[in-house]
Amino acid sequence: MKKFLLLALAAFALAACNDDDTPDEFVQGDNTIAVFENDRLVFYDYDVFWEYSEPYTDPYGVTCIDLYMNKTRFVQNMPALDMEVPGIPIHPTPAGFEFDLRQAVPYYRGEPMPRYTLYDLEGELNGTLLELEFSCIGYDVEYLG
């Protein structure tokens, strides 16, 4: 029994000395955002909720949605903001829709936020599951919700 306790204590001491600064294991689930830099997870948040408007037809006959990004942070030190990306052209699919934009400027309180321009914005609604990915201020962002 003493050997077991000593081994357990040694294992605990080694684990406590871990100086790895990478985030804990991240499991992507509903209403989560994951942020990567050079394919390395640098930030994640389980407290986001993104939603979208009902599809509508813009003046040019294009079917669009507005994306609402509630409590959004693209990097850890960014304040959580409620932002909107209006007028995203969508392509209907049997299970929902998909979209692919080269870039989009989000809005905060009705004002454009060009500093947070979203690049290579891709997304898909499959049933009730919304998946998005894009790049912003040098980070790759993935949302699942």
Regions from the PLM with identified roles:
Residues P23-A34, G61-Y68, T93-A104, L130-E131:
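Short, hydrophobic/aromatic-rich segments at coil-to-beta transitions
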Residues Y44-E84:
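N-terminal glycine/threonine-rich, aromatic-flanked beta-hairpin/loop signature
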Residues D47-P59, V85-P92, L118-G127, G145:
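Extended lipid/amphipathic-ligand handling interfaces
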Residues F4-L6, L14-F36, E131-G145:
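Bacterial Sec-dependent N-terminal signal peptides
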Residues L101-G145:
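Extracytoplasmic electrostatic interaction patches
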Residues T72-L118:
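Contiguous, well-ordered beta-strand patches that form the walls/edges
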Residues V35, R40-L41, N70-Q76, A104-Y107, ...:
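Hydrophobic lipid-interacting interfaces of membrane-associated proteins
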